[in-house]
Amino acid sequence: MQITETQLKQVDAQVKRLIALPDHFYGKRLREAGITGVSSVEDFLALPFCEKQDLREAYPLGLAAVPESEIVRIHSSSGTTGTPVIIPYTKKDVEDWAIQFARCYEYAGVTPEDRVQITPGYGLWTAGIGFQAGCELLGAMAVPMGPGNTEKQLQFMMDMQTTVFTATASYALLIAEEVEKRGIKDKIRLRKLITGSERAGEKIRKRIVDALGVEYYDIYGLTEIYGPGIGINCAHGHGMHVWSDYVYVEIIDPE
């Protein structure tokens, strides 16, 4: 594995903070595993894993690692396959998330001159509000449409001269098909498409790009770690770039 000295120090500080919390989910797991700190790669490899069920068992606020007075927001997984996972956010978490998402926009070539139409859902889901926070921090104009109402989406796309469209891949495909069907491609100014929450194969991506004439970007994220915006592909199309000063990614052999 590859991990820098700076990253080890960051992990060590966080681990020691969690161990000191008497009734905290992660602190308890670390103490049970005999962890006292992380000063080497060997120490890092000894950290215990957490699985989805572990996070569900912490419902509702067992994952909070700060006093409740410091929690400014919660988000939640859908809970369609079991108890939802609730993630508490501090003010700093919200700010850091916006910084990462703003980077995603910049990586995709979005500027403060752009008009960004945001169609992912809001509410407990992390998608819409994440797209909006990064957009506003960057300084672009957010058009917070939310999901559905395709007729209005297309009307705003034309009236507002939207230049960046954000959506799930399936909704982007629906919009692309409607633009073709209605023959309005010459009435829109889209230049970028950023999708998230769903995987899209090369065939679907090409279909969307051909119909809308846009550059296609795909973000990465998950509710348990900030939300969407912790990574994005670049214009060269060689996989995802993850913000390693915020998130350390390790690929684990399940065996």
Task: Name the predicted role of every residue range.
Residues M1-R17, L138-E255:
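Active-site glycine/GP-rich loop and adjacent strand/helix microenvironment
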Residues M1-S76, G82-I99, R103-Y107, I188:
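Nucleotide 5′-phosphate-binding alpha/beta core
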Residues I71, V94, G121-G123, S170-Y171:
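Short glycine-enriched loops at secondary-structure junctions
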Residues G82-Y89, E113-P120, F156-M157, T162:
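Short acidic, glycine/Ser/Thr-rich loop/turn "cap" segments at secondary-structure junctions
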Residues I86-T90, V110, A127-G130, Q155, ...:
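Short, conserved acidic/polar surface loops in the N-terminal third of protein domains
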Residues D93-V94, P120, M141-M145:
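Short, flexible loop segments at the rims of nucleotide/cofactor-binding pockets, characterized by
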Residues E106-A140:
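Conserved AMP-binding loop of ANL adenylate-forming enzymes
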